[in-house]
Amino acid sequence: MASTGATPMMQQYLSIKEQHRDAILFYRMGDFYEMFFEDAQTAAPVLEIALTSRNKNDTDPIPMCGVPVKAADGYIGRLIENGFKVAVCEQTEDPAAAKGLVRRDVVRIVTPGMIIDNALLEKGTNNYVVCLAHADGVVGFASVDISTGTFRVCESSDLRAVRHELLRIAPREVVIPESGADDAALSPFVSLFPPAIRTTLANREFDYRTACQRLTDQFQTRSLEGFGCRGLKPGIVAAGALLSYVNDTQRQKASHLTGLEVYSIDQYLLMDEVTCRNLELVANLRNNGRQGTLIDVLDACVTAMGSRLLRRWMLYPLLSAEAINRRLDAVAEAKEGLGTRKAVRELLKQVYDIERLTSRAVMGRVTPRDLLALKQTLFALPGLATELKSFDSPFFSFAGEPGPEGLDKLAGLADLLKAAVREDAPVSIADGGVINPDYHPRLAELVTISRDGKSSLARLEATEKEKTGISTLKVRYNKVFGYYIEVPRSQVGAVPAHYVRKQTLVNGERYITDELKVFEEKALGAEEQRVRLEQELFADIVGRVTACSPMLFAVARVAAGIDVLCALAQVADDHDYVRPEMLSGGEIIIEEGRHPVVERMLSGERYVPNSITLNDTDRQLLIITGPNMAGKSTVLRKVALFSVMAQMGSFVPARRAAMGVVDRLFTRVGALDNLASGQSTFMVEMEETANIINNATPKSLVVIDEIGRGTSTYDGLSIAWAVAEALHDLHGRGVKTLFATHYHELTELENTRPRVKNFHIAVKEWNDTIIFLRKLVEGSTNRSYGIQVARLAGIPGPVIARAKKILLDIEQGTYSFEAKSGTAPGTGQSGPVQLSLFTPPEQMLVDRLQKVDISTMTPLEALNCLHELQQKAHAISETDG
């Protein structure tokens, strides 16, 4: 992009572009944003717009493309989705008043995490940017959603927990020091996210003192201790660097970030990304969509704020039984108060997304339509406050925040918006037509002049027609030529001498007159003044909204909570959910429980409920067997989902549920090859299992749906057996575990471990087929019904028949390998071949081991027996060698 011989405008462009080389520059020129050089070549195919060139006749024309200002948000969104940043460069002075080149500057930088425009955001999901820092083995991270004013900070020395938390936040952008990708402490976390959403800042931005100063200046406080930041260091560094990034990209102070929410990872039920994915809490396994997820079932919220808060409650279930019960009390009250709940939900439907509306107002991005939405919201508040008086729970009240005084101020703001903003206000303030004329006397005067001008224009046209005798004469206006008289070519001969030609057209001529010039100056002067005054009044109104932003954010917090609680009550009422009893111990008791998602997805089929009990005495580890498709996975996931639902404050689909608080929730459910990182199914299984064994506590809940399938049968059985024993014996107390398996041998654990119980999913055989009863019953089963399931899946009949023959031979201890001729290879006739895990000498060792009665042996006898077996093993090994 050489600037030699460039025009002043292009020199200005190149100068601005030089400062934003990592972004596509949207350069404002009139009603368009233009892109040039490499930016144009990159953006045109992504945006599916024409790539043209500036100065086409030059030997080296400049590639260019452009998009209309009015449609820019959509184009910016597409670039962001494709991994680009966009620097928006505006004309910062009135072109009509400019002396020479119009002054321009970048007013904001749009990145994946720095989005505030509603059209580019998902209404029910926060849009987080996260910043990472570390010191002395501790990783700190801060997260901001600039669209809602949320600012959170956390730090931990538990690196695995940090990983899980970052993935739970699911940021749209990650900010790191320039050395972060090569930093041994940060690189494992940086690598979790694709390069397209990583942003680097200079290392100097990650200075502790600088961070403290930035944050106290932002929050207008003397220290950060009031936010609970005592002892935090890398967390503060991350927060300070992130604040600098936010203010820099927005080219202003993000004044709606008024405080820090400090939290600890262990404040909430710990669920890693594997568990969240396997349980399909907020995204399904099929296509990462919302359908078929827990949030899809529970989200009956009527506001966007409520949907976001519900998602947060779901991903951050509580650990305090007292706090859980406070939420459950509120849900119970809303469930019982049907009439009030219905009225409250109807009023909440009139409440727009106050968080994002207010954020846009503070950041100067609010539109006239936003103000109308805010007005409607504010007028709904008094009625909402009145209805909420029927409830006793403090969750259902504005008394705490914003309080009576705050509500009064917001009522005044509502009256102001009603008086000021026209109901038919356009999307943009650019051309006026937003402010009610009666709101300001000078505006009313200018509107009258403009209105009278239109009448005068009509009279002038009629007069000219009469004077000239040209009945087809028209007086018109456009932004390029102003006012003009247009005469068809057939009537040009009748044009008076005092008409001055202004433009020649194919079908006629355009003229001006002295009288029309006088009218134009008067009319355009009034119109320009009206638009300018409206813009000034609009800015003043936005300033008043901004002044009320603390109260508006307070209303948003309360309204979101009310919406979530009423939504949970509505779901409970509609689908026969019950309040879970929160126990002080570790028991989990579910009577006739139903999977919340599966029961809603069944069409015309009756859901079969199941009861289950887990405790720390005799039912701590449940071995669950049964055929594929019988419903083992549904039972397992249901119990895990009940823990999530109860601890987030939701009722559960059951006849009765009593739940102890779970501190960590682990799932090992199925597996897919992670080919990108070279991991097989079996390796993924083992890593997930290792995570469970290494991190589960006696207060955790573990759900394992098959283990060991990715290796040989005997290896898999051995591993599954050992893992089950390890979970039973973990920390000397064990951990509550649901263990579904196809290895029926594991049912023997009930005889060797005191807290193991066998269960199976009942199946009924009928006419050589099976009927899934979907019922969990106590006891084991030794059949998998794999062939019957294969038939149901559509495997051809001959294959099924052959499988049944092979199964029968194997069950009888023989299997005949037949050559193509129908005879066994090398024998001339078919013959049995015994399938055995061990060779004969090894079998002798196995037989000897089976006869050993450890319970009757002294320690010395046991050692002697072990020595004997070891000697025999050495002998067998030498013989084989």
From Swiss-Prot:
Keywords: ATP-binding, DNA damage, DNA repair, DNA-binding, Nucleotide-binding. InterPro entries: DNA_mismatch_repair_MutS, DNA_mismatch_repair_MutS-lik_N, DNA_mismatch_repair_MutS/MSH, DNA_mismatch_repair_MutS_C, DNA_mismatch_repair_MutS_clamp, DNA_mismatch_repair_MutS_core, DNA_mismatch_repair_MutS_N, DNA_mismatch_repair_MutS_sf. GO terms for cellular component: cytosol. ATP binds at G626, P627, N628, M629, A630, G631, K632, S633. GO terms for molecular function: ATP binding; ATP-dependent DNA damage sensor activity; damaged DNA binding; mismatched DNA binding. Signal peptide: none annotated. Pfam families: MutS_I, MutS_II, MutS_III, MutS_IV, MutS_V. PROSITE patterns: DNA_MISMATCH_REPAIR_2 (PS00486). GO terms for biological process: mismatch repair. SMART domains: MUTSac, MUTSd. Belongs to the DNA mismatch repair MutS family. This protein is involved in the repair of mismatches in DNA. It is possible that it carries out the mismatch recognition step. This protein has a weak ATPase activity. This is DNA mismatch repair protein MutS. It comes from Desulfosudis oleivorans (strain DSM 6200 / JCM 39069 / Hxd3) (Desulfococcus oleovorans).
